[in-house]
C-alpha cells in the first residue's frame, strides 16, 4: 500500500515548509485535478503505455479503481493501495465458518470411548473361548468370573474341579481315558486313571493315600521300622 502524506497549500520559505493547510493522503496511481477531482491511471506492462482509468470524486474511489486494474495486469502480486478482500479475512473467519457448520448439523464422527476396565475386556475374551481375540489380533488372558468347585482330600490337599470351567469353554475338555484297577501290596487299593495316547497331556497330582502297615499288636515291634 503506497500512501504518502502530502501537505496542501504549503509554502516554501528558506527551505522550510509552512503548513497552512491540512495533510491529505496520496495513493498510488491517483492524481488530484486543480478543480478538486481525482484522476486514476495505470501503466500497461504489455504495451508500455499509460491507461486512463477515469476521474472520481474521492481519492479512495480512484485508488480502488487503480487496485482493480493492477490485479488484472499483474495478478495477485501487484502492488496496490488496499489489501485484497481475501487478505482482509482474519483467521477467526474460518473458525466461525466451522462453528456455524457444526451448528447446522455437520459434526465430526465421535471417537469410540477408551476401554479402561481391563478385567471386563479380558473377561469377554475368556467367555467366548478366545475366538474374538484371534479374529481381532488382540492378546487376552482368561479371567475366571465363575469360581471353580474346590474339594478337599483326607490329607487336607485342595483339588480344583474343572467341570465348571469346561462348561464356560475356558479349559478344553481332555480326551476320554480308561480306568483300570491298581493293586498295592497284594490288596486291591482302588482304581486309577490310565490316560490313552490320544488324550491330551493333563498333569495330575496323584496321591497314594495312607499306606497300610501289617502289624500284630500281640507281637513286639520290629527292630527297624
UniProtKB/Swiss-Prot annotation:
GO terms under cellular component: nucleus
Gene Ontology molecular function: DNA binding; DNA-binding transcription factor activity
Low complexity bias locations: 90-101
Induction details: Strongly induced by ethephon (ethylene-releasing compound) in buds and to lower extent in leaves. Strongly induced by cycloheximide and mechanical stimuli. Wounding leads to a both local and systemical transient expression, independently of ethylene, and through a de-novo-protein-synthesis-independent regulation. Not influenced by methyl-jasmonate. Induction by purified xylanase from Trichoderma viride (TvX) and another elicitor from Phytophthora infestans (PiE), that appears to be mediated by a protein kinase cascade, and to be negatively regulated by protein phosphatases.
Organism: Nicotiana tabacum
Keywords from the UniProt entry: DNA-binding, Ethylene signaling pathway, Nucleus, Plant defense, Repressor, Transcription, Transcription regulation, Ubl conjugation
Protein name as it appears in the record: Ethylene-responsive transcription factor 4
Short motif (EAR-like (transcriptional repression)): ranges: 215-221
Gene for this chain: ERF4
Any one GO BP annotation for this protein: defense response
Biased composition (Polar residues): 1-11
Family from the record: Belongs to the ethylene-response factor family. Class 2 subfamily.
